[in-house]
Amino acid sequence: MSVTSWFLVSSSGTRHRLPRELIFVGRDECELMLQSRSVDKQHAVINYDQDRDEHWVKDLGSLNGTFVNDVRIPDQKYITLKLNDVIRFGYDSNMYVLERVQHRVPEEALKHEKYTSQLQVSVKVSAPKRGDALPDHTPYCESSQPRPEKGDRRHGAEAVAYRTPLYGQPSWWGEDDSGAPSEDRHQEEPYSERPKDLAQQNGELDSCRAPAEPPDYSFRREPSYFEIPTKETPQPPRLPEVPTQEVPTKDQEAGVGGTAPVVQSHASFTIEFDDCSPGKVKIKDHITKFSLRQRRAPSKETTPVETVSAETKVADWLVQNDPSLLRRDGPGDDRHSTKSDLPVHTRTLKGHKHEDGTQSDSEDPLAKTASVSGASAEASGEQVRLQRQIKRDPQELLHNQQAFVIEFFDGDTPRKKRSQSFTHTPPADPKADKRRGPGTSDRDRPGVSVRATGSSSGPQRASSLKREKTEERLGNTSPVPRASTRSFGSVGRRSRLAQDFMAQCMRDSSPATRPAPEKTPPVLPAPLTPRGASPVTPSTTPPPPTDPQLTKARKQEEDDSLSDAGTYTIETEAQDQEVEEARRMIDQVFGVFESPELSRVSSATFRPVIRGDKDESSDGGMAQRMALLQEFASRAPGMAPQMEQQSLLVPGSPGGQKWVSRWASLADSYSDAGLPEDGPGRRTGEPEGPLPVRTRRLLPQLPSGRADSPAGLEAARRNGPGPPELGSEPANCLIGQEDLDPDSLSDASGSDGGRGPEPGTERQEDLAWVRGRRSPRAPGELVPTSFFIGDQNGEATFPKKSFVGPGEVDGPGRVVQTSPSARDGLYVSSNGRMVIQLRSGRSPEPDPAPPKETLTFARQESFTKEPTSGPPAPGKLPHISSHPLLQDLAAARASRLDFHAQDTHLILKETETALAALEARLRSKSADECDGGSTPRPPEDSLSGDSDVDTASTISLLSGKNGPSPTTPQTPGPQKESPLSPPTVPDPGGATPGSARERMSERQHRPTPADLGPGDTSRRAAMRRGHGSRGSLDWPEEERGSGLAHLPSSNHETPEATLAGRQGPRRKPAAPPPSPAAREEQSRSSATAQKVQQALTRSNSLSTPRPTRASRLRRARLGDASDTEAVDGERGTAANPEPANRAAPEQAKKLTRLDILAMPRKRAGSFTGPSDSETAPARTGFSGRSAELYSTSRKPTIAEARAAAKKAAATAANTGPRQPFSRARPGSARYSSNTRRRQQGSDYTSTSEEEYGSHHSSPKHTRSHASTATQTPRGSSSTRARSQGPRDTDDDEEEPDPYGFIVQTAEIAEIARLSQTLVKDVAILAREIHDVAGDGDSLGSPGPTRSPSLGNVPNTPASTISAREELVQRIPEASLNFQKVPPGSMNSHNLDQNMNDSRDDALTNKTRPRNREEVIFDNLMLNPVSQLSHAIRENTEHLAEKMKVLFQNTGRAWEDLEARINSENEVPILKTSNKEISSILKELRRVQKQLEVINAIVDPSLNLDLLMGNRAPSGSGQPGLGKARPAAQSSTSPASVDTLLPALPLRSFPQRANCGPPGLPEPAFLPDAERFLI
């Protein structure tokens, strides 16, 4: 009889049969259980329409949504699923493809009394039955024929098993009783994922799977749900015997005519009677190798054999299926179903069970246990092999004519279930056997084999994928690599006996051999290359299996990989699986997985790379598969050369970062599209890619060497001693990477990641070279990971896999895109989803591969600070990718840099253009991703939002690419030189490109207070300038801010000169393209970027990663503005730096000030780092996230974004320090902190760099720059630096004078407005920062109120009071030091009030138009605020250190602190018209006080060196604050502001000095501020 069955085939190849009833999908107690933490407990419902024979999916209002074809479906609304629809639940790395299979139940089987009774029993024990069927089916993945066969059996068994699950119970309910069915089902799920992936990758899967499915479906589905298959069913199935024989494809590829091939289940299905569970019958398609393999090869001609086989096989299976013998699936079956029934599966789930009781699909304890089976290692290995083969290689089983799988199930220890298979047929394929040689190994790394095979044969890939995985485990140890033709081991698999023997042998020998495969899959010995290594099989060769325990561990890992879907695969070696898994899951969640390579190397066992790939399960296997994939990029853990092609590893490749969290892998899971790009390697990686796709969400991998995801070229070039190593094509990417390199940790990587080699490949190569030489870390040295979130379209996708630099220390763990194109180095998902390029490395220069082009936003937030070991070549601008937009930006940036030297405004405009280009790239990527069915946003958010890593970094990367990236590569030397030599101004055009980068670098390296002497005004100005567009770490921006006042006069030329000099030296290497051309290019880029940004925004909004705590806090603070929304808006707005470009996004996504402010904050405030310039140092100091986020903050619409950015910059500056300290988040607060240091001047001045450079030109220009710089440059120093140019231009465009030098009045007005906005933003951000960062309890308390009312920081009583108190405290200090702008301060306050009015009409509309005084005052106020924030940050930092040292003292310290803080709060509110500023200052003061108290408490005697060091710089300001506080409180806002500015700079300066770069500019800032005020 023919039955139609619907299956959800997961990217891992696991097939889930969809019952004709409503099933729940979720993490807990659901019929379809996913392990991804992004999947809600009850995420979605899949219902069945009997009339139309179609399934519906309805999202149950899940947090992360359900995506059909990468489009998020509305909640609570049924969406009809069509054939081949791709469904994703939350950010589960598994994508499920809906497939339909027409299954014919073999007449023989149905007639068979035993079978019928078993079916009936199965119906009773539906769960077990289904489980059985599933595993059976899984084997079919190996070959299309086996798959149908599996389908047949599976249909019967699964149908019964999957009869109608009780509501709330998984359909496999009861499977655990038999254990085998559960295992089958568990396996099925992973396999389904894999086939689905395969299907996505190849049509093969469909073809292979479809036929398999049809038989499976018909047989299984009808009987299982509606009736116990009786003898009626057998006859129809019997008919399709011949067709069944043929390799079933959806098309019935083997020639089954038009009808779906009816796979006769005679050999297809095994009926296992489980003695353990009386009612349980497992119908498996691995009945006998008897005919399965034959059928497969001679699909059509197999009919006769099949006919005979049907009966024979039924009999054989009945014999074999002695419940005890065939109880292969034991608790392992639960693996598949473990997802829901914890109680039942507890034993089974042991070691795989997640805390929530879910078990990853690939966490098949049974299989693992089988491998490990203590009873008999051999039996265990054999069992694993057999199980894997059975599940995955039914055909192979059939191929071995008669394979009797006898499973010895240890009832007491399900995991110890051993299966022995006796094959009466001579070994069919030594290769297959080898491939499967060590059953356990193969099982351990199913992904490897599957991937390898997948590449070799499309059709097989789908069905084989899983099988191969199993096989790989089974046959890893096999000496002979599996033939490529037998993708999944269905080709020439040895007899079970031979395989078992091989498994034993391999087990004996594997311990020695396994490490090699782990390290160098490509180099694996032939035995080690059963799958991946064999040339036929493009995929990486599976590592040889190791001892049974290792095999078991590997098997578990494989299982874990399978469950990667939403779960964190935990690879367990021989260690306690539960413990290992728990650890790994935790690590994954935190993106801290040891590099798979490392772990692999460390553990002989091939540990699955936890990268969210199904293949991830087995490191070796995956690594091997990857090896083929990335043969050149062999990601062997042992491969020290980062240049190894590993960088080409597919993001999803097993080599991917282990650290990839499932969330990260989610993003990775969409790197399928990119995979194919690699051609055979890629293709090989394709299965890998999809698998990775499902799990691959790489969190930054610190330990691994830099992974330059771009092609190995990029990796090589990065690793290469010099630029020559870089390939010309990758060179572009390299530039991007290089751009990132200097500050790759900081925003530089991220922001610049999106930019292609703007000046040229040469520059990128230089950058790569410089980066290589400047980064001290050895090639093998781990590089800080950078995430690039990009799209295929926008090459800036996050390479899901970390791009392994030359060494690819990550090796297997860090899968780099296999695609040769370095630009696409970021692995792009086939869906066009952004791939996360995870470049992990300790090196401060994660050098996020820019392979993705502009879109590749390197996640700047590397976990390690990038030590700018060598000055990156100035020409080595951080061009993250060679994306055309980026390239355009490169030219634009070069020109912009020239403009920078020439005109800060132009630079700003250029920066905006660059931002626009980045945004365009992002948007285009986003669009592509959307088209591809993937959304870059989830990966971005995912990285940032899903993972503990702050979402800001990802968002910032996407949105701004945060200009810092270009700066990042800047050579510290050139940077410093640049500021040192204002004369470089003459070299604005030529030096500009270099200078921007150098500025960033400079900012990074310049942090030394000595670097920027107060006397070195020009140099300081230059620094400021450099920092301005990129956001300066130092106070240059602040100096700029103060300089803004005096800039027009004395520092006026110096800033420009310095800026030019600075930029010139920095960007000097980059050929300065004609500013007009560059600008045009940038404009184009901007337009494109806008689109990209919009697309990204859409994508982000479409599939946003699960919000992190910070994002939730932000959301709560922001109210309706959600993290994603804020980021999207921020991105959209910021991404459109140019007025036109910007207008659309700006208007389209008009962000409220709060939204804008929240954006950087939203991005965990990590990226709140003032700007790229800030980001670079910030990143260096912290992650780049704050800066990048900040960047994003500044990216909003020119006016709004500018103001908001200004505010955000100020606020971020305030927030940054605070947040970093309050919030331990490195990416969020710390980045912000450094950023804020630079930003304090720049943000508050808002024109630190821009105003500095532009102020000398013209107030208006300064104004524009201020806003733009604050928004854009601050946000993304390098990208922003580019953006700044464009934005400046935009500002200019907004204002008649393009350069803005002429229109001083307009600029002043603009400045006033921006200052107003900035002040408000600062207040708002301060509130939010307090809330989120919880810097101080006092801050935290006001934070919530503050956060909601962006404009009403002062309005909010708590926040206002806190802020005001802080202001009062600070302002008195400031007043004492500086009382020169009473009118300005008043105006500033008025302006601020205006801002408030704009935000809240409640605030009196004071002078909306601002005078220069007002603007200056605002800047001054903001500068103090920024400085205050910086001081707070410093204090907090020191405090944190001290507390670490003296945590035991914190108890009493906190009490004292509380008292002191409370007393501080008592400080009278500053009487200023600018309530926001007052509140901000007060809050900051309060926070600082808290920090001071904490410091005092921690080290009351101030004995600690940290304390002393902090006190010295911090104390200078703090004591003054304390003393000045009363005066400030009493003093009015003007005096307070005036006083505050000087005092704060002084105060902040010491702190900054402690911090390093920020401190340097501060002295200059004070003079600047004074001058400005004067």
Curated annotation (Swiss-Prot):
Localization annotation: Cytoplasm, Cytoskeleton
SUPFAM superfamilies: SMAD/FHA domain
Domain FHA: start-end pairs: 23-73
UniProt feature, compositional bias: Low complexity: 370-382, 1134-1146, 1199-1213
Pro residues bias (residue ranges): 518-528
Pfam families xref list: CEP170_C, FHA
Principal location listed in the UniProt entry: cytoplasm
Keyword Heme attributed: no
Polar residues: bias regions: 452-463, 475-488, 857-867, 950-959, 1084-1102, 1265-1282, 1344-1358, 1385-1396
InterPro entries listed in its UniProt record: Cent_Immune-Sig_Mod, CEP170_C, FHA_dom, SMAD_FHA_dom_sf
This protein's UniProt keywords: Cytoplasm, Cytoskeleton, Microtubule, Phosphoprotein
Modified residues (Phosphothreonine): 540-541, 1289, 1345
GO cellular component: cytoplasm; microtubule
Residues that bear Phosphoserine: 360, 421, 478, 490, 534, 595, 617, 653, 709, 744, 746, 749, 751, 819, 843, 947, 965, 981, 1122, 1166, 1186, 1341, 1347, 1530, 1533
Biased composition (Basic and acidic residues): 147-157, 182-197, 325-344, 430-446, 465-474, 996-1005
Family recorded in the similarity comment: Belongs to the CEP170 family.
PANTHER family reported in the protein's UniProt record: CENTROSOMAL PROTEIN OF 170 KDA, CENTROSOMAL PROTEIN OF 170 KDA PROTEIN B
Cited function: Plays a role in microtubule organization.
Name of the protein described by the UniProt record: Centrosomal protein of 170 kDa protein B
Gene encoding the protein: Cep170b
